[in-house]
Structures are given as structure tokens and as C-alpha cells.
Design a protein with these regions (language model features):
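Membrane-interface helix-loop junctions in multi-pass transporters/channels
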Residues: 2-454
Length: 454
């Protein structure tokens, strides 16, 4: 259940029912329900995976409406209404303090479901799932290419801002840019993009921004520093990286809010409504959707064809060119797995759903990618050939770079930091950094120290 634009107001369609439920509960029970909703919301602030599909979202929404209508739904206090789990797929995820919330009402949510009937008539669940994967693949490859360009631009060869043996690691600029754009596309304007196309918002936030940023590369750079005995640089690398990424998303949210305010001043309310309604009828029309899907599929085929051709030409010579084209070929599976794992965000552990505030999907994706990258780095050190270096680096940059993400992680971190339980943000960050670094040390650093690899 989503609140209206004014956080303190309730949706008309169920406001009286929610107030009646709220007044009928004891204070302790009300507080527990509020904490449960907040825990689930912050955990789903970045991504909810394939639960965003219309079929699963519609069933969740229908069951929620039924429970509220019967007076059995989870009550929500008037003073602390938070977006529900269902809302994450169709509304902007924002800090819970109210600084950046742009939720939509239940009436708008129902209208949004009605506007999608044309798409649902022609898209079976399997075709819908394939459509999401096509969007994720296309935007995931674009994210890899953008990350490569930023790495080269700020790296030693051009601007010289970042390097391999510095706390300003090579992927820092892409993590900052991705976190900044997450504030725009994944928080403030997420609801607006959803009203244009649900596939587009997932393609941009999960596909593009999730692949533009990478946690596994960040963790591996810190492991390389620790192997060389630069422990102070290692600690500072994690600290400064988190500080810059977290403030990048804050800067993104605030600038996006300013831009939204400017648009509101420039456009009248009536013209804004007309614009929104026309956009809903546009891309959510099934013919338009299928046309865009075919176009994306063709462009994806072109990208894969070019990548395969270039890889064949440059593989024997090695170098960053061959590694990039291999990365483009293996990037989509990394995005798909991360999107699949995101379904476990907000679920908690066990049947009781304990620790719902921990995004276990994102946590699993980041830690597993970091461990696999560390293992491949160990193999690369042991084999030490040009062919192995091309294969390992390409897989690390493409598949593992897309499997892990900083933009989603930092969106969850920011939501926790803005919630009532600020400590959860730092506990989540410590959990991610600690487990990834310790496991990476066992897989990579220890073998390097024992065998004396260069």
C-alpha cells in the first residue's frame, strides 16, 4: 500500500479502513508492525528481482487489498505510513525520513494496473520474463561499456586520477557515477519511469546502473593492496569508497528533487497530468511494447555479433580490447543471476522471516561475486599466461562485474541510514565488506603468500 505524495496523507480508497485498524491495536503491536514494514521496505529499496513481474505483483496486490478490505490486513499507523513491499516495483524507493519520498497513491496504483491490460493480454508469463531479460541484457552491456570508458578516462593512461595500487581504485568513478544516477533513476524519478514502462525502469536501475557499478572489482583491489602489505590503504579504500558512493546517491537525490521542483514550476498541473496519461497509453500499449522489444533484440544481436567478431580478431594478441569484448559476451548472465537473487530481498531467514531488514539477495550476489573473482585471480597468478589473463580478466570485468553491484547496495544503505534504525546501514556495510574481504583473503591472499606469486 503506497501513500500519496504527501507522506502524512493516506490513500482515500483504504484510509478509513487503515485508521480503524490502527486505532484498534495496542501501542506495542502497532510499533512492531511499523518496524516490520520498515525492515521490509529498506531491504527492498534497491531491487526486488523477478517479483516485479506483473503476474506476481498483481497477485500480491490483490491479496493485500482483500485483506485490508476484510479488516485483517496489517495495520499501518497514521503517523508513520511506509511503502509496502509491493510498491517497490512501481513506486520510487526513497529515504524513509521523508526527504526524498515520491510515492503514488493506491488509486494511481490501480490505474497503473488497468493501463497495463493491453500488455498483459499478449504477454504470457514466460514471454514477460524473457522481455525483462532482454532489457537487462541490453542495458547490462551498456553498463559494462560505460564502466570501461570511465575506467580508461580516469585511469593512469589519460587523467591519472585512479590506479591499481591506490585507495582511489579504478572502478571508483563508475561507482560514484552509478550511485549518483541511482538517486535520479532509482529513487526520485523511478515512479515516473514506471508509468512509462516497467521494463525500462528495471533495465535502467538493475541492468544499466547495476552493471555500471561493481562491488567485486572494488573488493579485489583492496585484496591486492593487502597482499602487498598496504593495510592502511586497504582500510581507507573501503572507508573512502563507501563515503563517496553514499554521498553520491545523496547528491543525486537532492539534485533530482531540485530538478523535479523546477519542472513543477515550469509546467501547470493540468499539462503535467495530460503528459503522464499520454505516456501511460504510449509505451504500455502492447504494439508499442513489442516494437521496442524487437528493436532491443536486434540491437542486442548487433552488440553480441560485434563483440564476438572483435574478440576473435584480438584474442590471440590479448590486451584490454579482447578482455572488453569477452566481458560484453558474458555480462548478461551476471545481470540475470543478480536479478534472480534480488527476489530474496525483504524475505528474511526461515519461515519466520527474521532479519527482514537484511537484503540477502544483494548480499549473496556481492559476496559470491567477490569470492569467485578472488578465486579467478588466484588461478591467473598460478597459470600466468596471456590467454589465461584474457579469459580471467574478461570474465571478471563482465560476468562478475555485473553479478555484483554498488548502486543497489548503496540504495539499500541509504534507505537504512534514513530509517529509524540508522545502525542497520553500517551493520549491513560491515557485513558486506567483512565477509567479502575475509573470504577473499582465504581464497586469494593466503595462496599468494604461501606460493610467493608475483
Amino acid at each position: 500500500m503506497d501513500p500519496d505524495t504527501n507522506v502524512g496523507d493516506e490513500p482515500r480508497s483504504s484510509g478509513s479502513s487503515l485508521r480503524w485498524c490502527s486505532l484498534s491495536l495496542a501501542g506495542s503491536g502497532l510499533s512492531k508492525i511499523s518496524d516490520d514494514i520498515e525492515s521490509k521496505t529498506v531491504s527492498e529499496a534497491g531491487d526486488i528481482g523477478d517479483r516485479a513481474c506483473h503476474s506476481s505483483r498483481r497477485s500480491d496486490f490483490g491479496s493485500f487489498r482483500s485483506s485490508v478490505g476484510n479488516g485483517t490486513g496489517n495495520p499501518i499507523p497514521d503517523s508513520n505510513i511506509l511503502p509496502s513491499a509491493t510498491s517497490n516495483s512501481i513506486t520510487p524507493d526513497a529515504p524513509l525520513s521523508g526527504k526524498g519520498i515520491y510515492p503514488v497513491s493506491t488509486e494511481e496504483l490501480e490505474n497503473s494496473e488497468d493501463k497495463k491490460q493491453d500488455v498483459e493480454k499478449v504477454l504470457t508469463p514466460s514471454l514477460e520474463y524473457v522481455s525483462y531479460r532482454i532489457y537487462l541484457s541490453f542495458f547490462g552491456i551498456l553498463g559494462v561499456l560505460t564502466r570501461y570508458l570511465l575506467q580508461k578516462l580516469f585511469g593512469p593512461s589519460i587523467l591519472g586520477v585512479t590506479s591499481n595500487q591506490s585507495i582511489l581504485y579504478l572502478d571508483l568513478p563508475s561507482n560514484m557515477v552509478g550511485s549518483f544516477l541511482m538517486g535520479w533513476l532509482g529513487v526520485v524519478f523511478k515512479g515516473d519511469i514506471c508509468r512509462v514502462s516497467d521494463y525500462l525502469v528495471i533495465g535502467l536501475s538493475t541492468g544499466y546502473l547495476g552493471s555500471l557499478t561493481t562491488f567485486s572489482g572494488w573488493n579485489q583491489e583492496m585484496l591486492n593492496l593487502s597482499v602487498d602489505g598496504k593495510w592502511v590503504f586497504t582500510v581507507l579504500g573501503f572507508f573512502i569508497g563507501l563515503f563517496l558512493a553514499s554521498h553520491s546517491i545523496i547528491f543525486g537525490i537532492e539534485t533530482a528533487q531540485g530538478f523535479r521542483w523546477l519542472l513543477t514550476r515550469l509546467n501547470s498541473t493540468s499539462s503535467s497530468k495530460n503528459s503522464n496519461s499520454s505516456s501511460k497509453r504510449g509505451l504500455n500499449n502492447h504494439r508499442c511494447h513489442l516494437a521496442i522489444l524487437v528493436a532491443l533484440l536486434l540491437m542486442l544481436g548487433v552488440l553480441w555479433s560485434v563483440s564476438g567478431t572483435q574478440l576473435k580478431e584480438k584474442f590471440n594478441s590479448g590486451g584490454s580490447g579482447a578482455q572488453l569484448w569477452l566481458a560484453c559476451l558474458v555480462a548478461p548472465p551476471g545481470v540475470w543471476i543478480r536479478w534472480f537473487l534480488a527476489r530474496y530481498n525483504g524475505r528474511g531467514l526461515g519461515s519466520a522471516g527474521i532479519l527482514k531488514w537484511v537484503p540477502f539477495g544483494t548480499l549473496t550476489a556481492n559476496i559470491s561475486a567477490a569470492c569467485i573473482m578472488a578465486a579467478l585471480s588466484t588461478v591467473n597468478k598460478a597459470v600466468n599466461t596471456k590467454t589465461c589473463d584474457t579469459l580471467v580478466t574478461g570474465i571478471q570485468f563482465g560476468f562478475l562485474g555485473c553479478l555484483s553491484t554498488v548502486s543497489t547496495f548503496i540504495a539499500e544503505f541509504n534507505a537504512m541510514r534514513e530509517s529509524k534504525h540508522t545502525w542497520r546501514a553500517y551493520a549491513y556495510a560491515l557485513m558486506t565488506f567483512g565477509l567479502s574481504f575475509v573470504l577473499g583473503t582465504l581464497v586469494y591472499s593466503v595462496p599468494v603468500w604461501i606460493n610467493g606469486y608475483n
